[in-house]
Amino acid sequence: MRKRITSMITVISLTLCGTIGTYPHNANASAKEAFEDISKRSECTKVFDNDNGTYTAYSNTAPIHYLNNDEWKEIDNTLIEDSDDYYRNKDNSFNIYIPKEYSLGKNIKNPVIMNYDTFSLSTSITDIKMPDRPEEETFSEGVYADINNEVYTTIDNSAIAEGMKAALKKSASMATYHSIVEDIDLDIAVHNASVSESIIINKLESLPETITYSISVEDAIIKKTEDNRLQLIKDNEAVLILSPFTISDSSENVNVMQVEYDLTESEEGYEVTLYPAETVNRMSSPVMPLSLGSEYSYDRPFSTVYNSQASLHPSIIIIT
C-alpha cells in the first residue's frame, strides 16, 4: 500500500470539561446516553446532558459549529453532489465546491471554488513542467474524483459522547484525483475552517521543475507576506490565508522544506509558480513519495459566545 501524506489542519484533541452543573441526582435512575444541550453550543464546544444532574462539555481545537442567523449549526463536511460538474461540502459557512473532473491546461473548465461570507476564490493547476517531457504529455484529458467521506473512521475514546464522535467524523472529507500527470496524484481535503491540497509525487524522475496555479478572486487582491504566506485581502482586511507551500518526503523522520514560488498578476487574476525540483535537490536522500502541500484557511476571530445566557463553570478539566 502506498504511503500517502496529507495536510490536515483539524486535530482531534479534546478538552473534556466534566461536572459543569450539579443538580439533584437519582442514584436509581437507569443509565442513558448523554444528549446534547443545543442551547449551550459555541463555535468549538458541545455540551451534553448526562441525564444524572451533570453536564459534560467537549471543546475541539477547530470549529465544530458555525453561526447562521444567530443559531449555532453543526458543521458537516460530507461531500455531496451539487451539480453535473461539482461536489460540495454539505453544511458549513465555508462553502467548498470540488470538481468531479479535474483537468490541466490554460482553459480551466471546473476550478476548485471557495466561498466564505462575501468572498469568493477559484483555483486550479494550469501547468506542470516536467523534465525531458513534451508539454502536451503533461496535460490530462480529465481525471474523475474518488470521494472519501470517512477520513476519520474511528475515534477510540469511550469517554466521548456518541454525538460528539458523530460530529468529529463529519468534520473532514477528501477528493483524490489519480494520475493528473503520470506518477502524480492530487488530494483535496476539506476541513472545518480550511481546505488543503497535496500534490503526491510518486517517482523522483517525475518531479516537476515548475507547477503553476491560477487563482481568481472577486473584488479582492492577493499579497505575499514576508513569511511566504499569501493573504487574500478584501476591504483592507485579510479574509483568507494561504500557508507557505511545503514539500515533505516519506522518511521516518519526514524531511520538510518550504518551496520557493513567484506571485504574478494575470488576465484571470493571479498566477503562483512553484519550484519543487530546486527544493528537493537540497534534500538529503528524499524517500518517495513526496507531498507538496498548501492550505487555505479563512481568517476568523475565535468565538466562545453561547446561544444561551447560561454560564458554564467546569470544576473538572481533563486533557486527552
From Swiss-Prot:
One of its GO terms (biological process) is xylan catabolic process. Residues 1-29 form the signal peptide. The active site is at E150 (proton donor). Its main location: secreted. It is found in: Secreted. Its EC number is 3.2.1.4. It catalyses: Endohydrolysis of (1->4)-beta-D-glucosidic linkages in cellulose, lichenin and cereal beta-D-glucans. One of its GO terms (molecular function) is cellulase activity. It comes from the Bacteria. One of its GO terms (cellular component) is extracellular region. Keywords: Carbohydrate metabolism, Cellulose degradation, Glycosidase, Hydrolase, Polysaccharide degradation, Secreted, Signal, Xylan degradation. Hydrolyzes both carboxymethylcellulose and xylan. Probably has a role in hydrolyzing oligosaccharides derived from cellulose, which are transported across the cell wall. This is Endoglucanase E. It comes from Ruminococcus flavefaciens.
